[in-house]
Amino acid sequence: MIANDDEWKGTRARIAYFEDLLAQMRVAARPELFPSMASGYRAEIEKMQWEVLEYLTRHVSQPAPAEVA
């Protein structure tokens, strides 16, 4: 879970990096292998995007939710 603006910025950079990797794979990967190669990156991008939205829609005065172990 993103706890501060530094983590938010880092997560945004990581999303952009993964999106760039997917864009390269779309061109370079063999068509039959692409879905299995892309699925993990897609899942990670979706997870990070959810975390970004959770962070941005929580008012700055609200504490970050406790993480479940």
Q: What residue ranges belong to the model's regions?
A:
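Long amphipathic alpha-helical coiled-coil segments
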Residues: 59-69
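General nucleic-acid-binding
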Residues: 2, 18, 24, 32-33
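Short, charge-rich amphipathic interface segments used for partner binding and complex assembly
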Residues: 33-61
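Short, charge/polar-rich alpha-helical segments
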Residues: 1-13
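Flexible domain-boundary/linker segments
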Residues: 28, 32-35, 65
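Non-transmembrane amphipathic alpha-helical segments
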Residues: 11, 15-26, 48, 52-55
